[in-house]
């Protein structure tokens, strides 16, 4: 679990040449809740030196950014149900699962995440590689048409 701290580090880039913080949509001044992250998550992000992100110590109401790392479909369901109730309108939930090539034991695929998220009123809007082990799927609350 990340503590509420100010983060300053050097930018790192992934496969696309785009820093992970940009792919995920981190912005300076935002608050974020991250759960189950790999030990090198902060260095993977590669936030700019002047970026300030507040890491929430626990899930709370009206969150604007959540990133869950999990290998378990049952945990995914429990956590998404909880986050869905707490995410702000326009907020983002990233779910990361191990790539098959990582050989990390998991019962989650990209389709599993959609199967759980869509009935909850969440829609997937983006996918990205987090690192050599983790992929990520960006979810948002489905907007109701007027």
Predicted feature locations:
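N-terminal, charge-rich interaction modules
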Residues: 5, 9-48
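Short, glycine-rich nucleotide/cofactor-binding loops
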Residues: 66-76
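Mid-chain, well-packed structural core segment of small domains
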Residues: 78-107
